[in-house]
């Protein structure tokens, strides 16, 4: 469980950071930023995470000459995959801001970065928080795919136990319960946050 949590938390931090950058780039009027950002989102949303994990683990070292451990290959793949979804959350939040606020920022002489950090992002944070929390729940669930390249997370651990005791029904049922215990508080918190902020928007 600790490896699953470590993998998920690292992917959360990296995907949030990269997703914010990509989301802002997608809304940029500069084609050199918006075009690659849009393709980045499409590529990682329109290909299976499992394929991305396998490709980064087996193919990326061939291209770059750098070997990644199974853990870090999974972390990178999960971070890149989820950052595409985070980028869309940020983009949707940015689009939802009243255009009059942006125009007012221009009149005040604020540049694009200042408008984002001082006017837009503070307003949309409340709207983005529930889907971002849900995003972490998705990361926890998807982390099980890391077992395909040998990361010793929950699913891989259970598979090893089953090879010794041949009790798949009991072990996979326990595994499902463990994931439920991990994910339910996150999902419940996201729903509560959504209701809380909905009353204040």
Residue ranges of predicted features:
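Transmembrane alpha-helices and adjacent helix-loop boundaries
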Residues: 1-201
């Amino acid at each position: 469980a600790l490896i699953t949590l470590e993998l998920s938390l690292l992917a959360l931090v990296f995907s949030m950071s990269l997703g914010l950058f990509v989301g802002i780039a997608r809304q940029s009027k500069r084609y050199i930023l918006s075009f690659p950002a849009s393709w980045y989102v499409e590529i990682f949303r329109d290909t299976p995470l499992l394929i991305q994990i396998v490709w980064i683990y087996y193919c990326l070292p061939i291209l770059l000459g750098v070997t990644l451990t199974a853990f870090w290959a999974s972390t990178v793949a999960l971070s890149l995959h989820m950052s595409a979804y985070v980028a869309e959350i940020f983009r949707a939040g940015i689009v939802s801001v009243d255009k009059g606020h942006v125009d007012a920022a221009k009149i005040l002489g604020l540049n694009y970065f200042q408008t984002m950090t001082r006017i837009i992002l503070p307003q949309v944070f409340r709207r983005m928080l529930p889907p971002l929390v849900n995003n972490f729940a998705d990361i926890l669930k998807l982390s099980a795919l890391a077992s395909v390249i040998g990361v010793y997370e929950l699913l891989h651990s259970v598979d090893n136990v089953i090879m010794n005791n041949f009790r798949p029904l009991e072990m996979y049922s326990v595994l499902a319960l463990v994931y439920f215990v991990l994910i339910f508080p996150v999902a419940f918190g996201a729903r509560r946050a959504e209701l809380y902020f909905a009353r204040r928007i």
